[in-house]
């Protein structure tokens, strides 16, 4: 028997939220394969250095997100790890609260991975496209 959804029920998007310098950022959880305290992949990158070219990280990464390498077209699907400072959280946010980057800001963005924004507990969260991140 098919299940019927409540028309008032909003679609949710699972996000992994973390800090990058003074900002909070998020990746869609479907792109995060694992979350660990120590790097285990051959290829790693610090989120702050990766997103802010020429910026020295305030502190070394304390957590690691394992991501599928979008640049690698191998059968085994290579992975790499993104180092973040502080804790990360897995949260479900309503899809209608995720906003694309406005056209005027798009050419001025600091990273090609920046694709939108949302708010969590009245704090701005930068939405990143994991497929555009690479070490």
Which positions does each model-derived feature cover?
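An acidic, low-aromatic, low-complexity terminal/linker signal
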Residues: 1-135
């Amino acid at each position: 028997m098919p299940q019927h959804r409540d028309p008032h029920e909003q679609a949710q998007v699972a996000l992994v939220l973390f800090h990058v310098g003074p900002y909070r950022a998020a990746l869609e959880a479907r792109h995060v394969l694992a979350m660990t305290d120590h790097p285990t992949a051959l290829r790693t990158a610090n989120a702050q250095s990766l997103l802010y070219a020429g910026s020295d990280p305030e502190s070394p990464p304390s957590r690691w997100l394992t991501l599928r390498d979008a640049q690698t077209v191998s059968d085994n699907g290579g992975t790499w790890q993104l180092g973040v400072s502080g804790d990360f959280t897995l949260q479900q946010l309503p899809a209608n609260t995720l906003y694309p980057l406005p056209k005027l800001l798009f050419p001025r963005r600091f990273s090609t991975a920046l694709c939108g924004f949302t708010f969590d507990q009245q704090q701005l969260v930068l939405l990143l496209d994991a497929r555009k991140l690479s070490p």
